[in-house]
Regions:
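RNase III-family endoribonuclease catalytic core
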Residues: 1-131
Length: 131
């Protein structure tokens, strides 16, 4: 998207208000944008995406085990069904996350958010910021 929306609108959509607004902004900032703008090394979403990936897996695994699933193979298969690029992409699209992300110029020109992988990574970063 060429002009991102205000992050506060995303808070209204999700029903979650960030105490630390800089964390939300970081979760919405792609590395390319950060470099183009000369922002600090810790201003982009990459680390939060890694954290978010782990958090999402932990939540899903906890729910599966608490829900009575105890077979390791079954837990792994169900986790793969519930935590994958398509599910994360769809979750991101449901809140129109791509409209809030600060994309690099090349990313915006190429509409990289149409790639499931890129949008899934943005959703992971958002989850990491929520955590």
């Amino acid at each position: 998207m060429t002009a991102e929306l205000f992050p506060e609108q995303l808070e209204r959509i999700t029903g979650y208000t960030f105490r630390d607004k800089s964390l939300l902004l970081r979760a919405l900032t792609r590395l390319a944008y950060s470099k183009e703008q000369g922002l600090s090394e810790d201003s982009h979403l990459d680390a939060l995406a890694t954290l978010g990936d782990a958090v999402i897996e932990l939540i899903i695994l906890t729910r599966l085990v608490k829900g009575g699933e105890h077979d390791k193979g079954a837990v792994s298969l169900k986790k793969m069904d519930l935590v994958n690029m398509s599910v994360l992409r769809d979750a991101a699209r449901s809140i129109h996350l791509e409209q809030y992300v600060r994309w690099g110029k090349g990313e915006a020109r190429m509409h990289v958010w149409t790639s499931g992988r890129v949008l899934a990574e943005c959703m992971e970063a958002f989850a990491g910021a929520l955590y």
